[in-house]
Amino acid sequence: MARAPKPRIATPRRVRLLVATRKGLWTLTGDAARRSWKLAGPQFLGHIVHHAVADPRDGRTILAAARTGHLGPTVFRSTDSGKSWKEAQQPPAFAKKADGSGRVVDHTFWLTPGHASERDS
């Protein structure tokens, strides 16, 4: 009985590591063998970045959850692998009660890109 061929797994040409810190966001990009690395950043210098994640649906979009010193929590989005960033139009927020009261978001500690079947918007 012949064995089925092993599936081929694509080896990435580069590896990207997003490092979120209390001082900003750094990006390390390395070759597939992880022997050579380039450091870029910081992005959002002086702001606390709680989480950063690349969207696997396109490989270019990055989301970053940050807490700016005076404006509070926000989410930034890059569609060019971190070369430029756009801040969300509205900060993260809980739904308000009918009387206008409600809880306040202190920080966003985790972001999850949409499912592979969902459109990017």
Question: Language-model features: where?
Answer:
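Extracellular glycan-interacting surfaces
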Residues: 1-121
